[in-house]
C-alpha cells in the first residue's frame, strides 16, 4: 500500500510565509477600477508590487449595492488604512472605468491625509477598434 503524501500548507496551518507588512512605503500608486457592478481599489508601491487592496465585495456589499458610491468609499478607505499604517505619505492615483464609484473613491483617498502627486484617468478608449455589442431593447 502506498504512503499518504504529507500535506504542506493546508488551510488549517494558516499562512506559511510571513506577510510583508513590516516594510516602510513612503510613496505609492493607488489604482481605482470603477465598473458599474463593483469598485476595486489596489495600492501598489512604485515598482508595481501590490501592498494592499480592497473591493466593495470584500467590504461586505452584495448584489447591486456593490456599484454604489458609498461602497466605493468604504473600499477605498479599507485599502488605504493599511498603507497609512505602513507609512505612506505620497501617492499617485490612477482611475479606470465609468462606474459610479470614481468620485466617491477619490474623495475617500483625499480625506485619508495622503498627499496626491497627480490624479490620472486611465480608462481605455478604443481608437475605433472592435465593434460594440448591439443596443439593448427593453
Curated annotation (Swiss-Prot):
Origin superkingdom: Eukaryota
Entry keyword annotation includes RNA-binding: yes
Q: Which GO terms describe its biological process?
A: translation
Keyword rRNA-binding annotated: yes
Keywords from UniProt, A to Z, are: Chloroplast, Plastid, Ribonucleoprotein, Ribosomal protein, RNA-binding, rRNA-binding
Q: Write down the PROSITE patterns for this protein, in alphabetical order.
A: RIBOSOMAL_S11 (PS00054)
One Pfam family this sequence matches: Ribosomal_S11
Q: Can you cite an annotated GO cellular component?
A: ribosome
* Region annotation (Disordered) ranges: 1-24
Instruction: List, as start-end ranges, the regions of compositional bias called Basic residues.
Output: 9-24
GO molecular function: any one?
Answer: rRNA binding
Q: Where in the cell is it found?
A: Plastid, Chloroplast
Q: What InterPro entries does the record tag this protein with? A: Ribosomal_uS11 (IPR001971), Ribosomal_uS11_bac-type (IPR019981), Ribosomal_uS11_CS (IPR018102), Ribosomal_uS11_sf (IPR036967)
The UniProt entry, under PANTHER family, shows: 40S RIBOSOMAL PROTEIN S14/30S RIBOSOMAL PROTEIN S11
Q: Which family does it belong to?
A: Belongs to the universal ribosomal protein uS11 family.
Q: Tell me, how does this one assemble?
A: Part of the 30S ribosomal subunit.
* Record-given protein name: Small ribosomal subunit protein uS11c
Gene (UniProt): rps11
Amino acid at each position: 500500500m502506498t504512503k499518504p503524501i504529507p500535506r504542506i500548507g493546508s488551510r488549517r496551518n494558516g499562512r506559511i510565509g510571513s506577510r510583508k507588512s513590516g516594510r516602510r512605503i513612503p510613496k505609492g500608486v493607488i489604482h481605482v477600477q470603477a465598473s458599474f457592478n463593483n469598485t476595486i481599489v489596489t495600492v501598489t508601491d512604485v515598482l508595481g508590487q501590490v501592498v494592499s487592496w480592497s473591493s466593495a465585495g470584500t467590504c461586505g456589499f452584495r448584489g447591486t449595492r456593490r456599484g454604489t458610491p458609498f461602497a466605493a468609499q468604504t473600499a477605498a478607505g479599507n485599502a488605504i488604512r493599511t498603507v497609512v499604517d505602513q507609512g505612506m505619505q505620497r501617492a499617485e492615483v490612477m482611475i479606470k472605468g465609468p462606474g459610479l464609484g470614481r468620485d466617491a473613491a477619490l474623495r475617500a483617498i483625499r480625506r485619508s491625509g495622503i498627499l496626491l502627486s497627480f490624479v490620472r484617468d486611465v480608462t481605455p478608449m478604443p481608437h475605433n477598434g472592435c465593434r460594440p455589442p448591439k443596443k439593448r431593447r427593453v
